[in-house]
């Protein structure tokens, strides 16, 4: 059994990660660290786990007793922890924050998008889980980058559920504001754009276009629905074949020949992609569950690869659908 520890156990991504690991046939959770909830039952915070676990939050960190450590911490906290603690050299680490997503000589974390870096993830000890918007958008663009087709600016509109803002209440996550409402935030300046550009340049070294990304807040709890518009003269049939070939060995990305919607992916680790051609413009529609494929599900996917397991173990999940 893989012995797992979690640091930062009270948020939405941690709750989903705990749910996945409890039901994973090859994992035993040894501890869930939360300084604000130490001594409380997991079900005091994650009430959806009633009847599934008797685990209790702890403020202890028995790092020598585990094989893999997940960070579900606020941005900046993972780096602080790594800089201030003596972490066992053979301990595998999966960081769900943005601290190590950008390549640097200062760290050895691999960017954890399996559809881009599968082989490197399999041989890595340290993996930086991608952002939720970044995952959804990259999966819609990677096949184009591989074929060197991203030569003009890319227009992206993407709407996310309220869980994307985290568990801590705020003015824009309050029900009376969010319900029956929509708004944009961080237009052209979202923090996920640099990691998207980094990945596209990895496949298409000449990539130097702008990503004009407008994020939207949706009035639903979970999911990301993104539309990407790219100028492209290649015929639709050939483009569909490019996407199918690119994702042929990937279990969680599916090219669909008709319109897609969030209910087909919410509660799963899937990404669905639909393509349409309008003159010289290619419309790519990509949708995921922000808490699973965009966070905790992808983290478990990375863990499976790092421990040489079949990649879908513990991740065969039914979508909400209706």
UniProtKB/Swiss-Prot annotation:
The pathway noted for it is: Amino-acid biosynthesis; L-arginine biosynthesis; N(2)-acetyl-L-ornithine from L-glutamate: step 3/4
Q: What is its EC number?
A: 1.2.1.38
- Entry keyword set: Amino-acid biosynthesis, Arginine biosynthesis, Cytoplasm, NADP, Oxidoreductase
- Output the GO biological process annotations, alphabetical, semicolon-separated: L-arginine biosynthetic process
- Give the main localization category: cytoplasm
Provide GO CC annotations from the record. cytoplasm
Query: What are the protein's GO molecular function terms?
Result: N-acetyl-gamma-glutamyl-phosphate reductase activity; NAD binding; NADP+ binding
Localization, per the record, is:
Cytoplasm
Q: Which SMART domains match?
A: Semialdhyde_dh (SM00859)
The protein's job, in short, is:
Catalyzes the NADPH-dependent reduction of N-acetyl-5-glutamyl phosphate to yield N-acetyl-L-glutamate 5-semialdehyde.
What's this protein's name? N-acetyl-gamma-glutamyl-phosphate reductase
Q: Which organism is it from?
A: Phocaeicola vulgatus (strain ATCC 8482 / DSM 1447 / JCM 5826 / CCUG 4940 / NBRC 14291 / NCTC 11154)
Q: What is the lineage of its organism?
A: Bacteria, Pseudomonadati, Bacteroidota, Bacteroidia, Bacteroidales
């Amino acid at each position: 059994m893989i012995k797992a520890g979690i640091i930062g156990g009270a948020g939405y991504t941690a709750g989903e990660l705990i749910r996945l690991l409890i039901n994973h046939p090859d994992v035993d959770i040894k501890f869930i660290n939360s300084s604000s909830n130490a001594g409380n039952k997991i079900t005091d915070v994650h009430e959806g786990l009633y009847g599934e676990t008797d685990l209790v939050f702890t403020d202890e960190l028995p790092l020598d007793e585990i094989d893999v450590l997940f960070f579900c911490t606020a941005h900046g906290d993972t780096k602080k922890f790594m800089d201030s603690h003596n972490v066992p050299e053979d301990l595998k680490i999966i960081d769900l924050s943005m601290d190590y997503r950008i390549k640097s000589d200062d760290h050895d974390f691999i960017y954890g998008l399996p559809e881009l870096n599968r082989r490197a993830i399999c041989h890595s000890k340290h993996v930086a889980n991608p952002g939720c918007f970044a995952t959804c958008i990259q999966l819609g663009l990677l096949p184009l980058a591989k074929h060197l087709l991203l030569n003009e600016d890319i227009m992206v509109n993407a709407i996310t559920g309220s869980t994307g803002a985290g568990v801590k209440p705020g003015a824009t996550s309050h029900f009376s504001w969010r319900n029956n409402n929509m708004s944009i935030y961080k237009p052209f300046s979202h923090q996920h754009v640099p990691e998207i550009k980094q990945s596209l340049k990895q496949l298409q070294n000449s990539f130097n276009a702008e990503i004009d990304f407008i994020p939207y807040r949706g009035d639903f709890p979970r999911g990301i629905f993104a539309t990407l518009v790219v100028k492209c003269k290649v015929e639709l049939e050939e483009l569909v074949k490019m996407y199918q070939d690119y994702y042929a060995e990937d279990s969680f990305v599916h090219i669909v020949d008709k319109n897609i919607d969030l209910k087909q992916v919410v509660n799963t680790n899937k990404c669905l992609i639909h393509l349409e051609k309008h003159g010289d413009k290619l419309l790519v529609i990509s949708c995921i569950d922000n808490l699973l494929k965009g966070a905790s599900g992808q983290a478990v996917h990375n863990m499976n690869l790092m421990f040489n397991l079949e990649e879908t173990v513990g991740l065969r999940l039914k979508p909400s659908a209706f």
